[in-house]
C-alpha cells in the first residue's frame, strides 16, 4: 500500500510538458494575427495611408517647409479659430459633467423600471442622427423658432433675439449631443462603488455632502476622467453641429478643415490643421491617461 502511494506521488507531481504549451501559445498568437490582418490592412489602406499622404502634403506644398504651419499660428483669424475650439470644447466638457453626473447617480442608485427608463432616455439620442438633432436645434433657435416665439408671445422681448450662428448655440447643441458620452462612463463607475461604503460613512456620523465628497466622488473619478476625455476629444473634432449652428462666423478647427479642403481646395493647409488637431487630441489623451493612473495610485495608497 505504501509502495503504491510512493510510486503514484512522483507521477502526479510531474510537470506538464513545456514544449506543448509553447506551441499552443505560438499557434494562438499566429491565429490572432491572422484574424486581425484584414482589419489592419483595411485601416492602413483607408485611414493611415491617406492621413500620411495628407500630412506629407502639408510639408511639401506649395514649397517644402513649415509655411502652412506658420500661417496657422501667425494669422489672427486662424489663431482665433484655434482658441475658440479649445474654449467651446472645454465649456462643453464642463457643462456635460455638471448635467451628466446627477443623471448618472440616478441611473446607478435606482434600479428596476426607473433605471431602464433613465438608460433609454440616455441611449435613444445616440440612435438618432447627429444631423437630425442639430437641425432640431436650428428649429428651436432660429429667428422665428420656439424660443423667440415664446418670448415674444409673452411680451418679454420686442424683437427676435439672435440665437442662431453664435458660440452659445454651438455650445448648447454640442453639450446636448455629447451628453450621453459623459453619463454612461460615470454611471458605470458609480455602479461599481460598493453600496456599503456610503452607508458605513453615514452610520459613522458623516453628512451626505461629506459622504459624496469623501467617498462617492473619489471612487467615481475613473468614470469622470473617461467621460471628460471622450467628450473633450470628440468636441475638438466635431463638424456637423458647428457647421449648421455656427455658420461661417463661428468656425472651429473641424469646420475650418472642411472649408479649406472642400470649398477652397487648399489641401496642404487643411493637412496642417489636421496635424495640429491630431497632435492636440493625442496629447490630451495621454494627459488624461496619466491623470487616471495617478488617481488610481492615490486611491490605492
Please provide the spans of the model-predicted regions.
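Interhelical loop and adjacent transmembrane-helix boundary motif
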Residues: 8, 13, 20-31, 69-78, ...
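Periplasmic/extracellular loop-to-transmembrane helix junction in inner-membrane transport proteins
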Residues: 29, 33, 56-94, 159-160, ...
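Transmembrane-helix boundary motif in ABC transporter permease subunits
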Residues: 91-123, 139, 191, 196-198, ...
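Transmembrane alpha-helices
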Residues: 36-45, 94, 120, 124, ...
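Short membrane-interfacial helix/loop motifs at transmembrane-helix boundaries
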Residues: 40-80, 140, 144-145, 150, ...
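C-terminal transmembrane helix and the adjacent membrane-cytosol boundary/short C-terminal tail
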Residues: 2-18, 187-202, 271-301
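N-terminal signal-anchor/first transmembrane alpha helix
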Residues: 13-53, 116, 120
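Membrane-interfacial helix termini and adjacent extracytoplasmic/periplasmic loops
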Residues: 21-25, 66, 134-175, 209, ...
Amino acid at each position: 500500500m505504501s509502495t503504491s502511494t510512493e510510486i503514484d506521488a512522483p507521477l502526479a507531481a510531474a510537470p506538464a510538458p513545456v514544449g506543448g504549451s509553447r506551441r499552443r501559445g505560438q499557434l494562438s498568437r499566429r491565429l490572432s494575427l491572422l484574424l486581425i490582418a484584414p482589419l489592419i490592412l483595411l485601416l492602413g489602406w483607408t485611414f493611415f495611408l491617406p492621413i500620411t499622404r495628407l500630412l506629407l502634403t502639408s510639408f511639401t506644398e506649395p514649397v517644402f517647409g513649415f509655411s502652412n504651419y506658420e500661417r496657422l499660428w501667425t494669422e489672427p483669424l486662424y489663431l482665433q479659430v484655434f482658441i475658440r475650439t479649445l474654449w467651446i470644447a472645454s465649456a462643453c466638457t464642463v457643462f456635460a459633467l455638471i448635467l451628466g453626473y446627477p443623471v448618472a447617480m440616478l441611473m446607478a442608485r435606482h434600479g428596476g423600471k426607473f433605471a431602464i427608463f433613465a438608460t433609454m432616455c440616455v441611449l435613444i439620442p445616440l440612435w438618432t442622427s447627429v444631423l437630425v438633432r442639430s437641425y432640431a436645434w436650428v428649429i428651436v433657435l432660429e429667428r422665428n423658432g420656439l424660443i423667440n416665439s415664446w418670448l415674444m408671445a409673452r411680451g418679454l422681448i420686442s424683437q427676435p433675439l439672435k440665437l442662431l450662428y453664435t458660440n452659445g448655440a454651438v455650445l448648447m447643441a454640442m453639450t446636448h449631443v455629447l451628453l450621453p458620452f459623459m453619463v454612461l462612463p460615470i454611471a458605470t463607475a458609480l455602479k461599481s462603488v460598493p453600496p456599503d461604503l456610503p452607508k458605513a460613512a453615514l452610520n459613522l456620523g458623516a453628512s451626505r455632502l461629506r459622504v459624496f465628497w469623501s467617498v462617492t466622488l473619489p471612487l467615481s473619478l475613473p468614470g469622470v476622467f473617461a467621460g471628460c476625455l471622450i467628450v473633450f476629444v470628440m468636441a475638438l473634432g466635431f463638424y456637423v453641429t458647428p457647421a449648421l449652428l455656427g455658420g461661417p462666423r463661428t468656425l472651429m478647427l473641424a469646420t475650418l478643415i472642411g472649408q479649406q479642403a472642400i470649398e477652397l481646395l487648399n489641401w496642404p493647409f487643411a493637412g496642417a490643421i489636421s496635424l495640429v488637431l491630431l497632435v492636440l487630441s493625442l496629447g490630451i489623451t495621454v494627459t488624461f491617461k496619466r491623470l487616471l493612473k495617478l488617481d488610481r495610485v492615490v486611491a490605492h495608497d
